[in-house]
Amino acid sequence: MGEHGKSMKTIKGPAIFLAQFVDKQAPFNSLDGMCKWAADLGYKGIQIPTWESFLIDLDKAAESQTYCDEFKGKINSYGLEITELSTHLQGQLVAVHPAYDLMFDSFAPDAYKKNPKARTQWAIETLKKAAKASKWLGLNAHATFSGALLWHTWHPWPQRPDGLVEMGFKELAKRWLPILNTFDENGVDVCYEIHPCLLYTSDAADDLLCVDLGGRRII
């Protein structure tokens, strides 16, 4: 059997990211409601946004195998599997340019708003918790955003000085290395979802491939 045939054998069915459907109205305001809704539509997997506390208690998930077993069991009871945990909002807060502080503050808990340094540290610690929770849940991949320090330079005037992009990616690597180390320790791959404000040209993608991330490959 060829590689294509082998990969087809591992496909279990469609999965869905719950974040886009969260609402104050049932069935989109509870874990049970969303699981039943997804299962009834024929989905086999769900990606769980960790910033929605009614879906998952990330603090407990990072510390308790019992909590994770019960959490996973509930989801499995609907014929669903967890594909990944998601920290898209928290990951974006790892690296926020000051020009966007006000807009991104809405992603953070009230205790960390209007305090960029504390907000960044909270985001980093949250990502580390997600790494541990992923391990307890038996997951080997995690979905997130990297943050974007250079979006304000997309079409600059005057032209950005030489070395600015490299400096931005170097700072991004500095902030992410401790997080990546934690995911490594827990046997979980980090999967960056690339939006236009993160890697906006092929040149920017090439620049990212040159970033020193402790010998890791960015695919």
Report residues per predicted region:
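Glycine-/small-residue-rich active-site loops that bind phosphorylated ligands and cofactors
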Residues: 23, 197-198
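Conserved small/polar residues in nucleotide/adenosyl-binding loops
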Residues: 200-205
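Hydrophobic alpha-helical segments, chiefly the membrane-spanning helices
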Residues: 211-219
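Polysaccharide-binding and catalytic clefts of secreted carbohydrate-active enzymes
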Residues: 147, 151-171
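Short helix-to-loop capping/linker segments positioned immediately adjacent to catalytic or ligand/cofactor-binding
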Residues: 179-181, 195-197
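Active-site groove signature of glycoside hydrolases
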Residues: 134-155, 186-195
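N-terminal pre-domain/capping segments
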Residues: 1-141, 162-177, 184-187
